[in-house]
Amino acid sequence: MFAAKVLVVDDSPTMRQFIVFALQRLPGLQIDEAGDGVAALKQLSSEKYDLLLTDINMPMMDGLKLVGLVRNDVGYKKLPIIVVTTEGSNVTRERALGIGANEYLTKPLQTAKLIAVVRNLLDPERRRD
C-alpha cells in the first residue's frame, strides 16, 4: 500500500470510529473525519484527498448531494467515492452510482469487504489517467 489521504463522512461518531479503526489496518493511510456534507466540503476545499467515503443520511447536507457536488468540482472529478449506507434499495444504489459514486456498501459493514474495496480504489494502476 502507498500513502493516501482518506476523508470519512458520517454523522454517527460510532460509525466513523468503526470505519477509521477498520481502515487503520491498511498501512500508509491518513484518515480525516467529517460529521456531515457541509463539513466535508470545507475539508475538501482545503485539503487534497485520494478517497472519499460518505454516508447518505446526514444533517445539513446528505451524502448524495455531497457526491454530486464533488463530481462537479474539476479538482475532484476522478476522486474515488464510496457510499456507505443503511439504505439497501436498488433505486438508491443506482442513484448513488449514477451521480458518481464508484462503490456502494450497505451497513452493517463487513470489515474485509470495506478493506478490499478501499484497496482496489486506491490501487495506483487503476488511478492512472
Enumerate the predicted regions with their spans.
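Acidic, metal-coordinating helix/loop segments flanking the phosphotransfer/catalytic sites
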Residues: 33-51, 94
